[in-house]
Amino acid sequence: MKGEYYKTKASVEEYIKLAKDVNGKQLIEKFKQTLPSNSTILEIGSGPGTDWKILNEFYDVTGSDNSNEFLNYLVSKNPKGKFLELDAISLKTNMKFDGIYSNKVLHHLKDSELIDSVKRQNEILNSNGIICHSFWKGNGSEIFKGLFVNYHSIQTLTKAYKNYFEILSIEEYKEFDENDSLLLLARKI
């Protein structure tokens, strides 16, 4: 996950404009069905904070990002919010959470990096913790705007998560095109 796209102020501003009408409200509705309100949540890759704000209406959310530019933006827009600088692979924090959420973040990880992240997610979750992650559906990988994008299938996600989580569901959904995305919900085992 070493791309430079989210590291500059100009690229962060470009992303905010491009993604201004995109949010994970439908994903969060699914998350809410499995995790009680007021639970502690880590959002991996909060970006401009669009989903963080929605999550924060229901949960005690700690946002995170690996981009200082996004973190500066998040803190300036949400001065009372809790935010951490975290790498999505190592997730170096001593904090524990009831749930972990990400929206189109973990697809930037290579398969081996995703496995490392999955192990670490399991470690920082409380007993019976819930994860909710979205991915682009497809095969293979590509470099897009200097960032690695790894596409996934139900099979690849099952393989990556099954040793650490009870998979509650993996559903196809539409973000831009019919069934272009996958939503994973799982419980720590």
Feature annotation, model-predicted:
Residues 104-105:
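Short catalytic micro-motifs in class I SAM-dependent methyltransferases
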Residues 115-127:
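A short glycine-rich, Lys/Arg-flanked "PGG" loop and its adjoining helix->strand segment in the class I
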